[in-house]
Amino acid sequence: MSNHAAGPTTNDPTNDPTIKALVARIDQDADPNHADITPAVEQLGELGPKVIPYLGDALNAKDELTRLHAQRALERALERHFGFVPGQGWTKPDGEARFRALWIKNGNYDADGAEPAREASIKAWLTWSSTQRS
């Protein structure tokens, strides 16, 4: 599953070199106490849903740890979108419920789930993200 066009265009949702670089480093320097978290996972999460088109390949990678890192980046990006602030919690009264409902609606992505289920969820997330651009 490739998210890359033949060449970058202004309509290409994956032409941000900073986000591309973060995804390329998604597996580097995992937290020794939390192997599912890396600096790139956290930085991607801070950027919100605009990172979703960049995560498609990592969410469907052969390596399960890469998929898990991509899942955590996706979760954090969505949590931020729905009002979660580290150290403060959910800042919108319905933020957590909306996050969880959307997660389920878009296939309940699971890094160690079956490939067909992952692919269906990835497709749903890519479709959803295409409706979120400002």
Model-derived segments and spans:
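Positively charged, low-complexity intrinsically disordered regions
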Residues: 5, 73, 81, 99-101, ...
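Amphipathic alpha-helical scaffolding segments comprising HEAT/armadillo-like alpha-solenoid repeats
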Residues: 12-27, 49-60, 81-91
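Eukaryotic acidic, Ser/Thr-rich intrinsically disordered low-complexity regions
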Residues: 109-134
